[in-house]
Amino acid sequence: MVRHGRTTANAAGVLAGRLPNIHLDDAGIAQAVTVGRSLRSVPVTHLVASPLTRTVETAKLLAAELDRPVPLTKDKGVVECDYGDWSGKKLKRLSNEPLWSIVQSHPSSVTFPNGESMSGAQQRAVSSIRRWVQVAGKESGPNAIVVVVSHADVIK
């Protein structure tokens, strides 16, 4: 599992959630290239990414550094948690919300206002990753290696 590189939203302290067109910034581009280089000698057989812009950008930059071509597949199963009303808001502002302390101390118990529960996001992602492990095993055998590019809360 690889988290996407730093984005313009991360740098601005904004909870991006599933907002479209959130791009990597220069630091995020460098991070993605570095991860790709560190995986260069790993025989990756499958590359999967959340369909959001920042994860696709990360995956493409990472893939360009691998020692062989690996096709990229976008999978909604590993997309970011739907933060609902919190999406696009500054983290400083959100830290004043009563739900914030629960998000920090017991995230699996949280459902975001007009959004998704963290446990639901986790179940969705785990199911998707298990499916990819099975697919990769069938297509590439027991030595298959799947790299999934996703989001911090999904990876946690």
Segments and roles (model prediction):
Residues 2-3, 8-69:
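Active-site-proximal alpha-helix that buttresses catalytic centers in soluble enzyme cores
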Residues 4, 77, 151:
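Cofactor-binding loop segments of dinucleotide-utilizing enzymes, especially the Rossmann-like FAD-
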Residues 8, 54-56, 80-81, 154-156:
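Short, active-site-adjacent cap segments at secondary-structure transitions
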Residues 9, 23, 65-127:
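Phosphate-handling substructures
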Residues 33-40, 122, 126-137:
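Generic structural signal for well-ordered alpha-helical scaffold segments
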Residues 44-51, 73-74, 139-149:
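Short glycine-rich phosphate-binding loop at a beta-alpha junction
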Residues 46, 99, 119, 136-139:
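Hydrophobic/basic alpha-helical segments enriched in Actinobacteria
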Residues 56, 127-156:
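Active-site-adjacent alpha-helix immediately C-terminal to a catalytic or transition-state-stabilizing loop
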